[in-house]
Amino acid sequence: MKEIIAIIRPSKMAQTKTVLEGLGFPAMTANRVLGRGKQKAIVGELGFEVDNKELLNQPGDMRYIPKTMLTLIVPDEDASLVVEAIMKVNKSGQYGDGKIFVCPIEDIITVRTSERGEAAI
């Protein structure tokens, strides 16, 4: 099993979710996050309200910008399909398109049923 963590533009969340659901991957966790990459923030990128305005207005070159972080757990054989789908929706060729991390998962347990492994996905 693989954990896929994708950090994407908030404006691409709905389309990414629709594509993943269409491929049979409706289960995911989404979080609003702040961060920055090599581009040192893109002005006007705000996709949601930020409670702590100080994070957006740091002195100097470093500004944090809102992103959406998706987390999915998929069988090993589906990881490439999911990564390619996320890339297809989110790749514009511009700074800020995001990052995707693929990590191994040792086990999953559903608390309610005690199912383990891929049966728990």
Curated annotation (Swiss-Prot):
It comes from the Archaea. InterPro entries: N-reg_PII, N-reg_PII-like_a/b, N-reg_PII/ATP_PRibTrfase_C, N-reg_PII_CS. The keyword Transcription applies. GO terms for molecular function: ATP binding; enzyme regulator activity. Keywords: Nitrogen fixation, Transcription, Transcription regulation. Gene3D superfamilies: 3.30.70.120. One of its GO terms (biological process) is regulation of nitrogen utilization. GO terms for cellular component: cytosol. It holds the Pfam family P-II. The keyword Transcription regulation applies. PANTHER family: NITROGEN REGULATORY PROTEIN P-II, NITROGEN REGULATORY PROTEIN P-II HOMOLOG. Belongs to the P(II) protein family. Could be involved in the regulation of nitrogen fixation. This is Nitrogen fixation nifHD region glnB-like protein 2. It comes from Methanococcus maripaludis (strain DSM 14266 / JCM 13030 / NBRC 101832 / S2 / LL). The gene is glnBII.
